[in-house]
Amino acid sequence: MATIATYLLAAVAEIGGCFAFWAWLRLDRSPLWLIPGMASLALFAWALTRIDSDLAGRAYAAYGGIYILTSLVWMWLVEGSRPDRWDTLGTVLCVSGALVIIFGPRGGQ
Protein backbone atom coordinates (compact mmCIF):
# COMPACT_ATOMS: atom_id res chain seq x y z
CA MET A 1 0.00 0.00 0.00
CA ALA A 2 2.93 2.35 0.56
CA THR A 3 3.71 2.14 -3.16
CA ILE A 4 0.17 3.17 -4.12
CA ALA A 5 0.23 6.02 -1.58
CA THR A 6 3.53 7.26 -2.99
CA TYR A 7 2.16 7.12 -6.52
CA LEU A 8 -0.90 9.08 -5.38
CA LEU A 9 1.31 11.68 -3.70
CA ALA A 10 3.33 12.02 -6.91
CA ALA A 11 0.17 12.35 -9.00
CA VAL A 12 -1.42 15.03 -6.83
CA ALA A 13 1.88 16.94 -6.75
CA GLU A 14 2.31 16.74 -10.52
CA ILE A 15 -1.27 17.66 -11.31
CA GLY A 16 -1.22 20.52 -8.81
CA GLY A 17 2.05 21.82 -10.20
CA CYS A 18 0.87 21.61 -13.79
CA PHE A 19 -2.46 23.16 -12.87
CA ALA A 20 -0.58 26.18 -11.47
CA PHE A 21 0.86 26.76 -14.96
CA TRP A 22 -2.59 26.14 -16.49
CA ALA A 23 -4.11 28.69 -14.12
CA TRP A 24 -1.46 31.26 -15.00
CA LEU A 25 -1.50 30.79 -18.78
CA ARG A 26 -5.07 29.69 -19.46
CA LEU A 27 -7.11 31.15 -16.61
CA ASP A 28 -5.26 34.49 -16.41
CA ARG A 29 -4.11 34.01 -12.82
CA SER A 30 -1.09 35.72 -11.29
CA PRO A 31 2.39 34.46 -12.17
CA LEU A 32 2.77 33.96 -8.41
CA TRP A 33 0.90 30.68 -8.94
CA LEU A 34 4.18 29.40 -10.39
CA ILE A 35 5.95 29.46 -7.02
CA PRO A 36 3.87 26.73 -5.38
CA GLY A 37 3.53 25.09 -8.79
CA MET A 38 7.27 24.61 -9.15
CA ALA A 39 7.57 23.40 -5.55
CA SER A 40 4.79 20.91 -6.26
CA LEU A 41 6.57 19.65 -9.38
CA ALA A 42 9.77 19.17 -7.36
CA LEU A 43 7.77 17.16 -4.80
CA PHE A 44 6.40 15.05 -7.65
CA ALA A 45 9.89 14.24 -8.95
CA TRP A 46 11.14 13.43 -5.46
CA ALA A 47 8.14 11.17 -4.75
CA LEU A 48 8.78 9.06 -7.86
CA THR A 49 12.31 8.36 -6.64
CA ARG A 50 10.79 6.82 -3.49
CA ILE A 51 9.05 4.06 -5.46
CA ASP A 52 10.39 0.60 -4.70
CA SER A 53 11.66 -0.23 -8.18
CA ASP A 54 15.14 -0.83 -9.52
CA LEU A 55 14.12 0.53 -12.92
CA ALA A 56 12.93 4.08 -13.49
CA GLY A 57 11.03 3.11 -16.63
CA ARG A 58 8.95 0.53 -14.79
CA ALA A 59 8.18 2.99 -11.99
CA TYR A 60 7.11 5.61 -14.54
CA ALA A 61 5.01 3.14 -16.55
CA ALA A 62 3.08 2.03 -13.49
CA TYR A 63 2.69 5.66 -12.43
CA GLY A 64 0.93 6.43 -15.70
CA GLY A 65 -2.21 4.52 -14.73
CA ILE A 66 -2.35 6.11 -11.29
CA TYR A 67 -1.82 9.54 -12.89
CA ILE A 68 -4.78 9.02 -15.21
CA LEU A 69 -7.06 8.04 -12.33
CA THR A 70 -5.93 10.98 -10.22
CA SER A 71 -6.31 13.40 -13.15
CA LEU A 72 -9.93 12.45 -13.63
CA VAL A 73 -10.63 12.72 -9.90
CA TRP A 74 -9.03 16.20 -10.06
CA MET A 75 -11.21 17.08 -13.06
CA TRP A 76 -14.29 16.07 -11.07
CA LEU A 77 -13.44 17.56 -7.67
CA VAL A 78 -11.46 20.68 -8.62
CA GLU A 79 -12.79 21.58 -12.06
CA GLY A 80 -16.35 20.41 -11.46
CA SER A 81 -16.68 18.18 -14.53
CA ARG A 82 -17.74 14.60 -13.90
CA PRO A 83 -15.92 11.93 -15.93
CA ASP A 84 -18.06 10.27 -18.59
CA ARG A 85 -18.30 6.56 -19.31
CA TRP A 86 -15.37 6.68 -21.75
CA ASP A 87 -13.19 8.39 -19.15
CA THR A 88 -14.19 5.68 -16.70
CA LEU A 89 -13.57 2.80 -19.11
CA GLY A 90 -10.18 4.18 -20.11
CA THR A 91 -9.24 4.65 -16.48
CA VAL A 92 -10.21 1.08 -15.57
CA LEU A 93 -8.06 -0.24 -18.42
CA CYS A 94 -5.07 1.92 -17.50
CA VAL A 95 -5.23 1.29 -13.76
CA SER A 96 -5.54 -2.45 -14.43
CA GLY A 97 -2.35 -2.29 -16.45
CA ALA A 98 -0.60 -0.24 -13.78
CA LEU A 99 -1.56 -2.77 -11.11
CA VAL A 100 -0.16 -5.61 -13.22
CA ILE A 101 3.12 -3.70 -13.51
CA ILE A 102 3.20 -2.83 -9.79
CA PHE A 103 2.23 -6.21 -8.35
CA GLY A 104 3.29 -8.63 -11.09
CA PRO A 105 5.79 -11.30 -10.04
CA ARG A 106 9.33 -10.56 -11.13
CA GLY A 107 11.04 -13.91 -11.56
CA GLY A 108 14.79 -13.55 -11.20
CA GLN A 109 14.78 -9.78 -10.79
From Swiss-Prot:
Localisation: Cell inner membrane
InterPro entries: UPF0060
Keyword Protein biosynthesis attributed: no
Membrane-spanning intervals of the chain: 4-24, 31-51, 59-79, 88-108
Bilayer topology term: Multi-pass membrane protein
A Pfam match: UPF0060
Keywords assigned by UniProt, alphabetized: Cell inner membrane, Cell membrane, Membrane, Transmembrane, Transmembrane helix
Superkingdom of this protein's organism: Bacteria
Keyword presence, Glycoprotein: no
This protein's GO CC annotations: plasma membrane
Family in the record: Belongs to the UPF0060 family.
PANTHER family on file: UPF0060 MEMBRANE PROTEIN YNFA
HAMAP family, sorted: UPF0060
The protein's name: UPF0060 membrane protein RC1_3291
Organism whose genome encodes this protein: Rhodospirillum centenum (strain ATCC 51521 / SW)
Lineage: Bacteria, Pseudomonadati, Pseudomonadota, Alphaproteobacteria, Rhodospirillales
